[in-house]
Structure formats: C-alpha cells, structure tokens
C-alpha cells in the first residue's frame, strides 16, 4: 500500500462547521521542471493556504514556495533562487474539468495545485544575477570572471563611415 500523501487534507470539519482553517504543508514533489530550470530533487515545496468553506465547496487561498536551480542563460553557471506563486482555487464535487479541483470523500489533494503553480512560476531562462555579463561569443571566456582581448564585431552597415575615417587620417 502506498504511503498517504501529505498533500491530502481532510476537510470534513471545515464543511460541517463552515469554519476556515489554515494549512501549511511541506513535502517533496518529484519531477518538477521546465526547459530551463527545476526544483532540485529532494527539495521541499511549501504550500501555505487558508481553506475557506463556500457551501459544499472549499476555496484555497495562499502561496506555494519552492527552491529552483538552472543554468544561467548568459554564462551557463548554475543559478539558484526561490519561487513564490499565489494560489486561489476552488475544490468541489463534482469538479469542472480545467476550472476547479476535485473534492472527494471529504478530502482535497493540494499536490496538483502545487505542481501547476510551481511549473508556471519556474524561470524558463534563468539568470545568475541581473548584471551577468555572459560568455564572450568569440573565445568563450566568462566575462564575469575576467576580460578578453577580443574586439566586438564591426557592423557592416557602418563600413562606409570607417573608410571615411581612414581617409581623413591618411590626409593629415
């Protein structure tokens, strides 16, 4: 028998007494990634929500937080950060496909909500820092760690002006 997910919450008392309740769940969710970054394996995802009764449904309002890592899009060094995404979703029985989440047998499962929020918030092109200089496109040196002697490529559209400058220098 599979172990019970910590993201499964019994909401019978919330529905019966119509009293809101705060839930904080910290657990691992495997395979959270997009093309540019991921939640490191073994890392905890924090789901902090207020569960509010709405008749026979439950509204979850709060945040989802998780660490992330991925290669910097400019220098390829590993970049790290923490994402935080807002959530405001409804759980009901029967659920409306794509609109609400299922509430079944007086239980809700926060994992699909957390998974969707994290995947939407993960950076697709991470930066190690805002002012990252990146790699030199000619020699490949990391310009955050040193400089190179490569000259920037000349724009061919300005070549006529370069010729004028050369002509002026020769005449003097």
Where are these regions (language model features)?
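Structured interface patches
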Residues: 1-172
